UniProtKB/Swiss-Prot annotation:
This is Oxidation resistance protein 1. Keywords: Mitochondrion. It comes from Cyberlindnera jadinii. It is found in: Mitochondrion. One of its GO terms (cellular component) is nucleus. Residues 1-26 are annotated as: Disordered. The gene is OXR1. GO terms for biological process: response to oxidative stress. May be involved in protection from oxidative damage. Belongs to the OXR1 family. Pfam families: TLD.
Amino acid sequence: MSFFKRKSKSPSPSAQPSNIDTYVPPPPIPIELDGYSQTTKNRLMSTELAEDIRNILPMRYQVRTNWHLVYSLEQHGASLHTLYRMMKPLTRYDKNGYILVIRDLKNSQFGCFVNEYLHPTDLRRFYGNGECFLWKSKRQGDDVAEEMGGEANHIQFKAFPYTGLNDFIIYCTSEF
């Protein structure tokens, strides 16, 4: 999507700039998360985390407001083949990006954005491009509240974009 603004013509270069305001795009539409079953206890993706991730996605992905859960360890079981099957696009023209979210034992989260669906490749072939990135987040809050068992109230988010040092982005195998 492109936005254009007509430039006002000034009678001379020394004339005062016009009072026409510059275009300010509206705030993004909030992200809606769907796909979790009602019984799912460990919902790793929150709307707050999704908004942090959306801010660094390529522009064509930022406009998407409905994010659908493709695979959950809790809902679909611990199977790499199931993950690959669930991610496979319905058509070859389906160009979705995917976000992987993992929670560690310290309740921090990390993951990645990949611009292609995960699938095993032969002969150690890598795929993906420089749009892919890694990220991590940790809930931060008042230290006293955390010590007292209260819930932290802010996510500290950090992204690690593609460096261009090599093209080894995504590699998947069914050998596990």
